[in-house]
């Protein structure tokens, strides 16, 4: 039978909790926090430990100090509106072990249970180490849930924070659950300002377990890596309506080597209506035959950010129909995608000049028409077209495109190559001298380039006598007024000729 035990840790009682039980740990104030050791309590790994907010605290701020190592089955707040501050002293470690659940599956490890009528419910780990483990991993296949969605039918906010002095280690895959109402997308927030590590070592082989931001039509969660955060994690899934933010100064490494993820899978998946905002540093180290990123939602790369994809796997980014990859980072090769961007009906937005300087842009046909929006004098390595691919390039104010090569051949059998009769390039808001190449291939069929205001089949390369290389230029279609003027002059001349006869 499950039991609930309420403990006032100022009472100096001696208590052993050895059966399945929920232990309520009553709070203290900032000047007089509640120390776990004062009660002389020992707990079994089957215990749920619950910081309990004491309404006697005048400001709603509740303080707990864990000053001994303990292992519990779950750590969760009650339903009050309060801020619960948890710190650990003398190297104390909180271990959350899912093994007592005794079966395969997904199990709550940290949970915020506040209900709507109590407003905000937050838990703040200010220092120390939290380990999430499965001590019976040879017997049970388990994953760990971090839940901010319990008792959350309304608009109450739930915030879980790990400050810069904390470390969260998980030997299990982590699932972050937000509140079950996407009308309030910012009310379920996890702030990770310290270290997050999901590695596990087996016989000397290290692998990193996955993290997933759970979301759907009715659920959403925001996970923030703060400016002091470091993360070493495995496959990362950002599901619908969820947001992952990487702040300036944060360092996030996604490593799927030894992870066993299936071939052709991505290392980072951004679903429809999901968002990844990168303002810090993101590095992806992939296992063989996997894609670095699959984008069905939105990725924004800020001006101080870097994205580095060079180590293992296919080393590419795939942007599908409905997906957008928006780049503002200013450093040369600050978005380094070793094996290129694949536009499969998706959109690439370039707001900086050199971020993609060494990257090839592949065009695929199976996603429909792909798009590039230019807002700067953007530099990339080359295009590579596949049969049936269509690309629209929008030249917005200040936008131009500079390529090392117009096209390159990709693959052993040349399945992606030059612009030919099976592909199409459309230029929007184009003027002559906005597309520059250092070199081009004779095989490129420039008659497959179309732009409003230019005669079809008129595009050609013109030598750039200042910078070297070549400009793409075409013959403009005469303006209607000019055409009318020419016709008028012709008619006048014809009439004069007839009079002379």
Region locations from a protein language model:
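Bacterial N-terminal signal peptides that target proteins for export
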Residues: 1-6, 497
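Membrane-interface capping segments at transmembrane-helix boundaries
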Residues: 499-501
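A short, hydrophobic C-terminal helix/tail in secreted or cell-surface proteins
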Residues: 479-497
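Extracellular/surface-exposed low-complexity segments
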Residues: 21-58, 374, 394-477
């Amino acid at each position: 039978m499950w039991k609930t035990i309420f403990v006032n840790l100022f009472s100096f009682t001696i208590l052993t909790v050895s059966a399945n039980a929920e232990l309520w740990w009553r709070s203290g104030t900032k000047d007089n926090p509640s120390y776990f050791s004062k009660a002389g309590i020992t707990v079994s790994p089957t215990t749920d430990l619950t910081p309990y907010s004491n309404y006697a605290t005048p400001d709603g701020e509740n303080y707990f100090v864990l000053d001994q190592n303990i292992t519990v089955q779950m750590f969760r707040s009650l339903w009050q509106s309060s801020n619960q501050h948890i710190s650990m002293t003398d190297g104390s470690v909180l271990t959350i072990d899912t093994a007592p659940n005794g079966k395969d599956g997904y199990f709550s490890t940290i949970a915020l249970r506040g209900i709507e009528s109590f407003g905000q419910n937050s838990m703040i780990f200010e220092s120390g180490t939290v380990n999430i483990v499965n001590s019976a991993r040879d017997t049970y296949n388990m994953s760990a849930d971090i839940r901010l969605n319990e008792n959350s039918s309304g608009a109450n906010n739930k915030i879980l924070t790990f400050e810069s002095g904390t470390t969260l280690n998980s030997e299990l895959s982590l699932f972050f659950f937000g509140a079950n109402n996407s009308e309030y997308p910012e009310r379920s927030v996890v702030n990770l300002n310290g270290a997050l590590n999901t590695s596990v070592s087996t016989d000397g082989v290290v692998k990193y377990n996955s993290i997933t931001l759970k979301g759907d039509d009715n659920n959403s969660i925001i996970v923030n890596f703060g400016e002091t955060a470091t993360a070493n994690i495995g496959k990362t899934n950002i599901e619908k309506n969820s947001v992952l933010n990487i702040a300036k100064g944060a360092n996030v490494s996604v490593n799927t080597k030894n992870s066993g993820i299936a071939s052709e899978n991505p290392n980072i998946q951004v679903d429809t209506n999901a968002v990844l905002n990168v303002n810090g540093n993101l590095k992806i180290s992939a296992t063989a035959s996997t894609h670095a990123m699959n984008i069905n939602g939105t990725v924004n790369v800020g001006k101080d950010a870097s994205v580095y994809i060079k180590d293992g796997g296919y080393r590419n980014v795939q942007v599908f129909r409905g997906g957008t990859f928006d780049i503002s980072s200013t450093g040369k090769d600050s978005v380094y995608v070793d094996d290129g961007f694949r536009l499969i009906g998706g959109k690439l937005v370039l707001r900086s000049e050199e971020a993609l300087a060494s990257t090839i842009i592949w065009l695929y046909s199976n996603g429909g028409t792909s798009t590039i929006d230019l807002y700067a004098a953007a530099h990339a390595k080359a295009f590579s077209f596949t049969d049936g691919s269509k690309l629209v390039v929008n030249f917005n104010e200040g936008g131009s495109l500079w390529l090392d090569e117009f096209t390159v051949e990709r693959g052993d059998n040349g399945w992606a190559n030059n612009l030919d009769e099976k592909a199409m390039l459309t230029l929007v808001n184009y003027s002559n001298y906005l597309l520059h190449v250092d070199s081009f291939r004779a095989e490129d069929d420039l008659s497959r380039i179309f732009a409003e205001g230019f005669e079809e089949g008129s595009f050609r390369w013109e030598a750039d006598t200042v910078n070297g290389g070549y400009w793409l230029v075409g013959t403009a279609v005469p303006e209607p007024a000019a055409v009318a003027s020419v016709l008028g002059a012709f008619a006048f001349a014809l009439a004069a000729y007839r009079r002379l006869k």
